[in-house]
Amino acid sequence: AYGVQPGTGWYTPAGVIHAPASVVTYEPQWNSDVNTIMENVTMGEVNPENLLTDCQPKEEKGDVDALFAQIDWEESTRKDYKQKYIRAPKPLPETQKGLAEKWVAYANEWIAAKEVTVAPGAKVKLSDQACYCALVVQGHGKFGTFECEAPGVLRYGDISGDEFFVSESAAKKGIVVENTSSYEPLII
């Protein structure tokens, strides 16, 4: 196990056994119909067996050998795992006043994640070559025509303004993002 450093990303290939960090992290990934939770106790709570077997085909239900065959043991136990898969933040050159961008997940052909910081009072235009999901993790302002805000206390069923999907065409045109705070950065 490796300590998680805030702001640092990891690339975890499919089949590599791993666990969530003890701090809030984001794990960008592509769609998959496989999810096997092999941890039987989490923070003192016993996980039900169905979390282990739900994604097994009917003919393999309860087959422990089939469960363990899902794991890529060679990648999961490689001695240079950290060196190969850690993703230190890569700051991008400043292109607009009040905008700081850095890659936090990269170096694979399927997914990437960028942290975008808009300074207090700044208005910037974000352009990209592909569609993306934007998550507001700190601050408030405008994301295109919408109000955006990192949630403080969010209860089940509440509406929030922290998640946006940007189509490829909109990403290429650019989205205007404004931080309406006088004090706090807007971090997406």
Q: What are the roles of these predicted feature ranges?
A:
Residues A1, S22-V24, W110-I111, V118-G157, ...:
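Glycine- and acidic-residue-biased ligand/ion/polar-headgroup-sensing regions
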Residues G3-A21, W30, V137, F146-S181:
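Conserved metal-binding segment of the jelly-roll/cupin
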Residues T8, V16, A21-Y26, E109-K114, ...:
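Structural beta-strand/beta-sheet cores of well-ordered domains, especially the beta-sheet scaffolds
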Residues W10, V34, M43-N47, V124, ...:
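A generic structural micro-environment signature
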Residues A21-N47, V176-I188:
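A short hydrophobic beta-strand segment most commonly corresponding to one strand
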Residues T36-C131:
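C-terminal amphipathic alpha-helical segment
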Residues V46-K61, E168-G174, T180-P185:
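Intrinsically disordered, low-complexity coil segments
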